Amino acid sequence: MAFRAAVASGVAMIGVGAYAAQGSSATANASATIVNPIAITKTSDLVFGKLAVGAVGGNVAISTANVVAISGAGTTVSQPVGNAGNPAAAVFGVTGEAGFTYAITLPSDGAVTISDGASHTMAVNGFVSNPGTTGTLSGAGTDSLKVGATLVVGNNQVPGTYTGTFNVTVSYN
């Protein structure tokens, strides 16, 4: 009798512990597509040209279409006719993944100065680009980016050759 009770009790316990939770699973794929990195290379520099400056400075703007505009109240800044020194916007080549759009970041006002190597400087402000703030890479994965700006010429600016650098950044959107 004791054996029957033990067997009956064991069967009862097996029945209690035999219930299992029902589960379900699914499978997902993982993937990645590697694209060409975006890159920018300078093709030509921003050139304001040769300037004659008197007592009153002014602003010399170079558009992305290489158009020179001189402004400022009473300015005596001018470009000698026939000897302007080929003013031109900077040109950059952009390469990357075909058809992708990219953002263009230009220097902010006050961030760029050019110097004659001594203590004389001029600010370069008002940077503009073509395309504007966003470009699109061609089917070949290329684009041309032009950058113009405005040179702030001081009163009685000391003669000399002034140079400096500026950065243009491109990144995928």
PLM regions with names:
Residues 19-106, 111, 139-173:
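N-terminal small/polar-rich segments of proteins
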Residues 120-151:
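Acidic, glycine-rich flexible loop segments
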Residues 111-123:
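Short aromatic-acidic-glycine turn motif
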Residues 1-7:
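Bacterial N-terminal signal peptides that target proteins for export
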